[in-house]
Amino acid sequence: MFSMVTEFMNYSQQTVRAARYIGQGFMITLSHASRLPVTIQYPYEKLITSERFRGRIHFEFDKCIACEVCVRVCPIDLPVVDWKLEKDIRKKRLLNYSIDFGICIFCGNCVEYCPTNCLSMTEEYELSTYDRHELNYNQIALGRLPMSIINDYTTRTILNLPMK
């Protein structure tokens, strides 16, 4: 008889403990119900990126001196710089510059260490394609500035997300 009472007491303690855990989880769920939604309807609404966002790299051909610092500081030796030495003026002339964004890790080292500031990060992050070879941008594609999200009339921009 005594063992039956202790088993019943253990069972009731376990039931109370389980109900308390369920109640704690339910209270957390209820606290989230009063918050504003964090998700956005992506193709129709876009977040404005922060000032230091590391998106697609923009390249200015006229500023580049073909020093290849960007290649040396890149952890994966990604930028391809083709140049020709002009013997009469003893300077390099840039022929081709390309970056494959299918491989790029967007670390920003090339932008940070460029001595002439011919590289900069843009706010463009929509680089998806069906063919990975389309992600290999030459100097012409890198020179195009992306369309600003703020000026895009087809989408609604959201300035900032609600804080927790």
Swiss-Prot record:
It is found in: Plastid, Chloroplast thylakoid membrane. Keywords: 4Fe-4S, Chloroplast, Iron, Iron-sulfur, Membrane, Metal-binding, NAD, NADP, Plastid, Plastoquinone, Quinone, Repeat, Thylakoid, Translocase. GO terms for cellular component: chloroplast thylakoid membrane. Gene3D superfamilies: 3.30.70.3270. One of its GO terms (biological process) is photosynthesis, light reaction. Its EC number is 7.1.1.-. Residues 55-84, 95-124 form the 4Fe-4S ferredoxin-type domain. Disulfide bonds: none annotated. Coiled coil: none annotated. Binds 2 [4Fe-4S] clusters per subunit. Its cofactor is [4Fe-4S] cluster. Signal peptide: none annotated. [4Fe-4S] cluster 1 binds at residues 64, 67, 70, 114. It comes from the Eukaryota. Pfam families: Fer4_7. It catalyses: a plastoquinone + NADH + (n+1) H(+)(in) = a plastoquinol + NAD(+) + n H(+)(out); a plastoquinone + NADPH + (n+1) H(+)(in) = a plastoquinol + NADP(+) + n H(+)(out). One of its GO terms (molecular function) is quinone binding. [4Fe-4S] cluster 2 binds at residues 74, 104, 107, 110. It is a peripheral membrane protein. NDH shuttles electrons from NAD(P)H:plastoquinone, via FMN and iron-sulfur (Fe-S) centers, to quinones in the photosynthetic chain and possibly in a chloroplast respiratory chain. The immediate electron acceptor for the enzyme in this species is believed to be plastoquinone. Couples the redox reaction to proton translocation, and thus conserves the redox energy in a proton gradient. NDH is composed of at least 16 different subunits, 5 of which are encoded in the nucleus. HAMAP family: NDH1_NuoI. Belongs to the complex I 23 kDa subunit family. This is NAD(P)H-quinone oxidoreductase subunit I, chloroplastic.
